[in-house]
Amino acid sequence: MSRYRGPRLRITRRLGDLPGLTRKAAKRSYPPGQHGQARRKRSEYAIRLEEKQKLRFNYGVSERQLVRYVKKARAQEGSTGTNLLKLLENRLDNVCFRLGFGPTVPGARQLVNHGHVTVNGRVTDIASYQCKPGDVIAIRERKCSKKLAEANLEFPGLANVPSHLELDKSKLSAKVTARCEREWVALEINELLVVEYYSRKV
C-alpha cells in the first residue's frame, strides 16, 4: 500500500487529530460518508486497525515500511510499542517537522527529498534517515532553502520543540541532544493496540 495522497480532512474526521498529516481542523467531528453519524459498535480488530492507521497516516509511511519498523522495534530491547514510536519519531522528515522546518510531515519530507536539508554538513535527501544523538540537522546554505524554512518557522505545525532537539532559529539548524522519550510524541495513540494488530501478521 503506497502513501495516501487524497483529502486529508477526510482522514482526520475518521481517525481524529493527526498533527503530522494536516494542521487544518475538521468542521464535522463524525466520520465521512452516508452513515458517518450512525453509532456502530466496533470490533476489537476495528479498534486496533484504527490505531494502526493513525500511526501510518500521521508519519506518512506505507504499510510495507510500517511492517519493517515493527520488526525492528521487536528486535530492540524494551517495549515494542515505545520502540516503534521512537523509530518513527527519529525519521529525518519527522524531525524536520518537529523543528518547524516543514508545516506537516509530508511538507517536511518534500524539503528533505528536494535536497534542502543537511545532516552533519552533508545534503541528505533520504526522509527515512534515522536521526541519532549528536546529529546536526540544518537547512542548506541556499537562498531558496532558507526562504522555505523561515516561512514555515513563522507558523510551525506544533508549538513546542521536543527537549531532545536543540533548535537555533537564527542559524536554521538543530542538534539532536538525546534519544526521543515517549512523552514527547505529539500523537494521541495507544501503541500497544498497534503491536497487537501486528502480532499475528508479522
From Swiss-Prot:
Repeat as a keyword of this entry, yes or no, is no
Q: Which Pfam families does this entry report, sorted A to Z?
A: Ribosomal_S4 (PF00163), S4 (PF01479)
Query: Which Gene3D superfamilies does this entry report, sorted A to Z?
Result: Ribosomal Protein S4 Delta 41, Chain A, domain 1, RNA-binding S4 domain
Q: Oligomeric state and partners?
A: Part of the 30S ribosomal subunit. Contacts protein S5. The interaction surface between S4 and S5 is involved in control of translational fidelity.
Q: What is this protein called?
A: Small ribosomal subunit protein uS4
What positions does the domain S4 RNA-binding occupy?
Answer: 90-152
Tell me if RNA-binding is a UniProt keyword of this record.
Answer: yes
Gene Ontology MF annotations: rRNA binding; structural constituent of ribosome
Query: What job does the chain carry out?
Result: One of the primary rRNA binding proteins, it binds directly to 16S rRNA where it nucleates assembly of the body of the 30S subunit.
Task: Quote the SMART domains the UniProt record gives.
Answer: Ribosomal_S4 (SM01390), S4 (SM00363)
Source domain of life is Bacteria
* One GO term of the biological process aspect: translation
- Quote the gene name from the UniProt entry: rpsD
Alphabetical list of InterPro entries matching this protein:
Ribosomal_uS4, Ribosomal_uS4_bac-type, Ribosomal_uS4_CS, Ribosomal_uS4_N, S4_RNA-bd, S4_RNA-bd_sf
UniProt entry keywords in alphabetical sequence: Ribonucleoprotein, Ribosomal protein, RNA-binding, rRNA-binding
Which PROSITE patterns does its entry note? RIBOSOMAL_S4, S4
- UniProt family annotation: Belongs to the universal ribosomal protein uS4 family.
HAMAP family with a match to the protein in the record: Ribosomal_uS4_B
GO-annotated cellular components: small ribosomal subunit
- What CDD domains does its record include? S4
Q: Where is this region: Disordered?
A: 15-42
